[in-house]
């Protein structure tokens, strides 16, 4: 199949046209006075949103060359959102500003590669300054402010996330799911919970709640399937003598062994409950190890030469309370030693650092939360499905942003932090050579783009606002578009996580540099394109 090609300035100009169209649509949502964007759907009614990444995802341009430029910036906006939870609009606005000014200089005869090097040096200096300007989050209220700003100034979402983070801790897991009512609710799970329930309903102790409740329980952790009754009987006899209930967690329990357990339960000889071990393969073994650490027990594993028939009471874990329902098991207040739990937590943290897989990271984080933190499940409620999906997306963004704030600290918001990186970038210019200086100047001019855009969306001249903020000469003072006043942004609750601003700038500069050093575009012909006149500069 024949391809159509576009070269040099013609190629870059078409990509810029695509980036401009994308940025114009996305940038209108920026700031507290940002406007709504209405997106037509192929089914159902139109979606009304003020979320930059939602708008970006929907954009598909008719012109293939323009679409290539737009799609590359959309990818960067999405990557910024995935990494930091917010900053998609900021990244798009910065990418447009850097690419547009860079292209103007390249057309005038500057060296694209040198400009890109200059951009990279300037961004490195700006990021170092951002990290230096940042400070740790102090208190629940600042976490709430970060969440609210990320969720398009929704204070309810900010407060909700601040409460959840305070409850589960920084190592805790917060999951957001679609609810079944009109109200948004938060459910907290204390202790360790995993998604496996009782293997037989005969283990239930409370028929009103359909739960098996074991107080001051002993916990047997067995890696294999419980199949031989003779192996199990000695342990059951020892456990019955203590008068304590027994929780058995194993790969599976076969019919014969299950019958033995159920008969003992129904006769009142022993309060017992059996559940399948969570996870699969190596992950199952790791999770059983976590439960062993939490309860102070030993994982009975044939790899270690241990047999079920030789298990004594010393090998069993202990927990103050165990609750088992049809699909979940919750272990509260295990008897594990604090130092052993801390070692296990440190080991999981090291694994999180070492892995490159997002899926593995998520699973490690879940294990960490169950050992060191807690779990909060936010069920999003709304009047309509469209509203629910929008609220859920905003909640997820805000959750990432609040975690980013706790991780790397916070900065004054509203584009103030970027504007006050000018001195650091100007210092970097002294070390630049030749056309690299132009690259540094391009970043210098782009740093105020987010503040200009926020002001423009509020109906105020962005250039005037930037000049006014620079004249104040105070890194905390900025323009609060919500009130229309110049104020201390941190005190006003207008704050951004360091990670969000830093990631947005780094990603924007990266894609702009890539676009500026692009020399050729290659794409397929569309059927109808054959009847159109060739575009100037196009070779086919």
UniProtKB/Swiss-Prot annotation:
Forms a cylinder of 14 subunits composed of two heptameric rings stacked back-to-back. Interacts with the co-chaperonin GroES. SUPFAM superfamilies: GroEL apical domain-like (SSF52029), GroEL equatorial domain-like (SSF48592), GroEL-intermediate domain like (SSF54849). NCBIfam families: GroEL (TIGR02348), PRK00013.1 (NF000592), PRK12849.1 (NF009487), PRK12850.1 (NF009488), PRK12851.1 (NF009489). The gene is groEL2. Belongs to the chaperonin (HSP60) family. GO terms for biological process: chaperone cofactor-dependent protein refolding; protein refolding; response to heat. It catalyses: ATP + H2O + a folded polypeptide = ADP + phosphate + an unfolded polypeptide. This is Chaperonin GroEL 2. GO terms for cellular component: GroEL-GroES complex. It comes from the Bacteria. It comes from Rhodopirellula baltica (strain DSM 10527 / NCIMB 13988 / SH1). Keywords: ATP-binding, Chaperone, Cytoplasm, Isomerase, Nucleotide-binding. It is found in: Cytoplasm.
């Amino acid at each position: 199949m024949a391809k159509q090609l576009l070269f040099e300035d013609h190629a870059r100009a078409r990509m810029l046209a695509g980036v401009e169209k994308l940025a114009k649509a996305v940038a209108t949502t920026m700031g507290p006075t940002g406007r709504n964007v209405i997106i037509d759907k192929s089914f159902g009614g139109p979606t009304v949103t003020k979320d930059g990444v939602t708008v970006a995802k929907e954009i598909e341009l008719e012109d293939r060359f323009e679409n290539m430029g737009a799609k590359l910036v959309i990818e960067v906006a999405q990557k910024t959102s995935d990494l930091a939870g917010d900053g998609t609009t900021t990244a798009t606005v910065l990418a447009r500003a850097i690419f547009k000014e860079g292209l103007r200089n390249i057309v005038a005869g500057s060296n694209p590669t040198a400009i890109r090097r200059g951009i990279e040096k300037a961004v490195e200096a700006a990021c170092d300054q951002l990290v230096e300007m940042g400070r740790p989050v102090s208190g629940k209220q600042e976490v709430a402010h970060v969440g609210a700003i990320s969720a398009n100034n929704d204070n309810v979402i900010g407060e909700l996330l601040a409460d959840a983070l305070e409850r589960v801790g920084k190592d805790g897991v917060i999951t957001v799911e679609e609810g079944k009512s009109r109200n948004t609710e938060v459910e907290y799970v204390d202790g360790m919970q995993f998604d496996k329930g009782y293997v037989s309903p005969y283990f239930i102790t409370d028929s009103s709640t359909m739960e098996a409740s074991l107080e001051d329980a002993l916990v047997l952790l067995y890696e294999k399937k419980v199949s031989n009754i003779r192996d199990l009987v000695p342990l059951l006899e020892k456990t019955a003598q203590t008068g304590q209930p027994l929780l058995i967690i194993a790969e599976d329990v076969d019919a014969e062994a299950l019958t033995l357990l159920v008969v003992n339960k129904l006769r009142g000889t022993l309060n017992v409950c059996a559940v399948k071990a969570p996870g699969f393969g190596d992950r199952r073994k790791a999770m059983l190890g976590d439960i062993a650490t939490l309860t102070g027990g030993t994982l009975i594993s044939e790899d270690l030469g241990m047999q079920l028939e030789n298990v004594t009471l010393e090998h069993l874990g202990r927990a103050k309370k165990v609750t088992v329902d049809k699909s979940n098991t919750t272990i509260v207040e295990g008897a594990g030693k604090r130092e052993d739990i801390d070692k296990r937590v440190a080991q999981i943290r090291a694994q999180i650092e070492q892995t490159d897989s997002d899926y593995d990271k998520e699973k490690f984080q879940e294990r960490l939360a169950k050992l060191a933190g807690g779990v909060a499940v936010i069920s999003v409620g709304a009047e309509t499905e469209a509203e629910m999906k929008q609220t859920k997306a905003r909640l997820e963004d805000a959750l990432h942003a609040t975690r980013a704030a706790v991780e790397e600290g916070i900065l004054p918001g509203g584009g103030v932090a970027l504007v006050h990186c000018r001195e650091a970038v100007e210092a970097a210019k002294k070390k630049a050579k030749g056309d690299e200086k132009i690259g540094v100047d391009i970043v210098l001019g782009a740093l105020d783009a987010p503040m200009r855009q926020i002001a423009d969306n509020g109906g105020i001249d962005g250039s005037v606002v930037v000049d006014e903020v620079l004249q104040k000469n105070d890194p905390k003072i900025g323009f609060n578009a919500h009130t229309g006043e110049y104020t201390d942004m941190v005190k006003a609750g207008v704050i951004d996580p360091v990670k969000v601003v830093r990631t947005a700038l780094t990603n924007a500069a990266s894609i702009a540099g890539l676009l500026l050093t692009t020399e050729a575009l290659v794409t397929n012909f569309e059927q109808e394109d054959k009847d159109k006149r060739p575009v100037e500069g196009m070779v086919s």
